[in-house]
């Protein structure tokens, strides 16, 4: 295994056509009841009303045996082995997030409560599963080592 002296804060990985198709097939079989509405409001004294809507979306949490989990876990393990070599335990949490017109997820650092107490999120992933020609917005911004934001292309998969 090759050790890397310098590790980027992010890597772009493209899903295989087969993996993308399997994920889209899984998604096409979901019903509205499989999603949970999620709206988070936080205090913002600068905003005229004192609060901001931080996140408005529908979320599906796939079960551990789903194809979404299997493919996502495979990607995490491959990227980790190639670039990071973290000690990953078998703790993976995936969210399938669906946005409607007006939905949003404001700028945030991608950390939060781990699904298992005492564990720490080491890797995070974002995959666009809808053709970017079918929507506006959805830009993903990341911070590079120079502390500058970069916008990631909204490529499918």
Give the predicted meaning of each segment.
Residues 1-85:
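Non-heme Fe(II)/2-oxoglutarate
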